[in-house]
Amino acid sequence: MRSLDAFAGQKLAALDAQSLRRRLSPTRRHDGAVVERDGKRMISFSCNDYLNLSQHHLVRAAAAEAALNYGAGAAASRLVTGDHPLLSDLEKRLAHLKGTEAACVFGSGYLANTGVIPTLVGPGDVILIDALAHACIWAGAQLSGAKVVKFAHNDPADLERLLLAERGAARHALVATDGVFSMDGDIAPLDALSELCQRHDAWLLSDDAHGVGVLAEGRGSGALFPTAKIPLQMGTLSKALGSYGGYLCGSQAVVDLLKTRARTLVYATGLPPASAAAALASLDLIAANPTMTEVPLAKARLFTRRLGLPEACSPIVPVVLGSAESALAASTELQNQGFLVVAIRPPTVPDGTARLRIAFSAAHEDADIIRLADAIAKLRETAS
């Protein structure tokens, strides 16, 4: 055991030396955007609860009622006894939202991608992935055993070059991207990617974790491109929908295959009833008031105007500072001023691009957004 502890200690020391060690910070959420850490209350700009629906009384009530009616957990894999009725209801609603034949719900977004990708491709196939795609896409690709190729971020020309080079020797080809990129907030050119996939007989997977609920009246980034054909539409329930879980929307045949072969569904306990009920309640609220989905982007654009940044196209706005040390220092100073803006460091983002990742929600007050923008402007002036 001493060798194991020594190994762990050496790894931690190396991370400390680069300001890359991460630590958990217990955080209590209060009403609106207020959080509490170590007895100090702050306005959080680091939460992905874009519509503040996790705090909505109807969403909370739905979760509580489901726990009382069905139990606290699913108690088994969905293929055993864990497929409670709420999951079928949720899958129908998600498929309707995304305009597909069917949907498959997983325990999380990470489990969705690490289950879907190895089910669809394997040795003899090729996966082409956007350079800045989420870690769970890369993890799923590595598990698949397929050849993995990276294309330049949001660059259809580079993707086409690689398709021309790789597609002929591969049995199947999968192109995978985020719809809204989680660390930069930009949107994939899904129309151009779709056209290339159709031309080269490749399958397009879009991870819309940060688009569903906040773009195109809640339908997500794919709906911004009416001509795009996206056969594999993945997303989460844990961000704008304020619950927990992940899903893949697609054809009935694809979903049927996932439900019998995706290892992260077959060998994992089903999503708890409370999580499914909360997501259903959130979908009800969005359907009843689709204009609510416009608020997070409007808040983000208030911030970018105030700070003189390019106009936001999603609720995520990065302020890139460069080194991990500078990002940590800026985050600490903002906490001193009453704002929780977590520093994002490598390997989550590329070396030299450590940043403040600012996430806007319907819970944010305009006055707080302006105060944050002004505080960051002063930090940038001091740094320069």
From Swiss-Prot:
Modified residue annotations for N6-(pyridoxal phosphate)lysine: K239
Pfam families associated with the record: Aminotran_1_2
Keywords: Biotin biosynthesis, Pyridoxal phosphate, Transferase
Molecular function terms, GO-annotated: 8-amino-7-oxononanoate synthase activity; pyridoxal phosphate binding
Binding site for substrate: R22, H134, T348
Listed EC numbers: 2.3.1.47
Protein family according to the UniProt entry: Belongs to the class-II pyridoxal-phosphate-dependent aminotransferase family. BioF subfamily.
Function: Catalyzes the decarboxylative condensation of pimeloyl-[acyl-carrier protein] and L-alanine to produce 8-amino-7-oxononanoate (AON), [acyl-carrier protein], and carbon dioxide.
Record's subunit section: Homodimer.
Protein's name according to its UniProt entry: Putative 8-amino-7-oxononanoate synthase
Source organism (scientific name): Caulobacter vibrioides (strain NA1000 / CB15N)
